[in-house]
Amino acid sequence: MPDVKCVCCKEGKECACKGKECCTTGECCKDGTCCGKCTNAACKCADGCKCGSGCSCTEGNCAC
């Protein structure tokens, strides 16, 4: 299983999750380990996404 890269909400950087659930759980990765949940405020929604507080970080993207 190849490493999955997702946008880490902190500093807007990508990181390798190395098969962990960081991307699907909305956590940020650091050195291949989960290091904290993303907050709605940290999420960067795509253009046109107007979820407000209903925005959640999943796989580097925000979904309503």
Curated annotation (Swiss-Prot):
Pfam families: Metallothio_6. One of its GO terms (molecular function) is metal ion binding. The keyword Metal-binding applies. It comes from the Eukaryota. Keywords: Metal-binding, Metal-thiolate cluster. SUPFAM superfamilies: Metallothionein. Metallothioneins have a high content of cysteine residues that bind various heavy metals. Belongs to the metallothionein superfamily. Type 4 family. This is Metallothionein. It comes from Sterechinus neumayeri. The lineage of its organism: Eukaryota, Metazoa, Echinodermata, Eleutherozoa, Echinozoa.
